[in-house]
């Protein structure tokens, strides 16, 4: 009887430890969001065949930029990828495994997948542009796919951002 009680307690503790160690979205945000977005883009017939999933992922990766592009590179979804662990994504997706679990498996294969983080977005309505570094001002323009030809000083970048702000900033009323 005591042995049975100990087995139940150990089993409960093991389950508790497993759930507390489960990967959370914020621990591997680029992976989880990219896998979810990719899975949502697939139709039902494609989701059943892992080979079709791999083909669709390679096509999906061609349109990605920044962190998602790097994620694709790590998995082998790009032609220039050095390694390929695409089956670690495609097979679990064909089994309808959740994105968090897929990313947990991917992290075990390649830890740098979960090192990818989205950069914090700058709220242009509340930030004082004069207090930002030129690097951050350039990043704002780059994110907008805009350039600042002839900008040499910080004031030039601020002026260009102020000109473009109505076009790109979303202000809620």
From Swiss-Prot:
Tissue specificity statement from the Swiss-Prot or TrEMBL entry: In stage 12, expression is seen in the stomodeum and the salivary gland primordia, and weakly in the mesoderm. From stage 13 onward, expression is in Garland cells, the outer wall of the proventriculus and salivary glands. Punctuate expression is also in the ventral nerve cord (VNC), specifically in eagle (eg)-positive cell body glia. Epidermal expression is seen at stage 15.
One term under GO cellular component: endomembrane system
Primary location: secreted
Signal sequence, start to end: 1-22
Gene3D superfamilies per the UniProt record, alphabetical: SAP domain, Saposin-like
UniProt function note: Required during the maturation of the embryonic nervous system for maintenance of neuronal and cuticular connectivity. Essential for maintenance of dopaminergic neurons and dopamine levels.
PANTHER family per UniProt: ARMET-LIKE PROTEIN, MESENCEPHALIC ASTROCYTE-DERIVED NEUROTROPHIC FACTOR HOMOLOG
Stated name of the protein: Mesencephalic astrocyte-derived neurotrophic factor homolog
Organism: Drosophila melanogaster (Fruit fly)
Gene: Manf
């Amino acid at each position: 009887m005591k042995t049975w009680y100990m087995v139940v307690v150990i089993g409960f503790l093991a389950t508790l430890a497993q759930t507390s160690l489960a990967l959370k979205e914020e621990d591997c945000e680029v992976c989880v969001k990219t896998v979810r977005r990719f899975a949502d883009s697939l139709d039902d017939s494609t989701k059943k065949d892992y080979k079709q999933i791999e083909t669709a992922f390679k096509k999906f990766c061609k349109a990605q930029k920044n962190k998602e592009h790097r994620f694709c590179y790590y998995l082998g979804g790009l032609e220039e990828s050095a390694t390929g662990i695409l089956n670690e994504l495609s097979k679990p997706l064909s089994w309808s495994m959740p994105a968090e679990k897929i990313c947990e498996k991917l992290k075990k294969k390649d830890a740098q997948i979960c090192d990818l983080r989205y950069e914090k977005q700058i709220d242009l309505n509340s930030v004082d542009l004069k207090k930002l570094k030129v690097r951050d001002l350039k990043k704002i323009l780059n994110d907008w796919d805009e350039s600042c030809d002839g900008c040499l000083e910080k004031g030039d970048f601020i002026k260009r951002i102020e000109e473009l702000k109505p076009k790109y900033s979303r202000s809620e009323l």
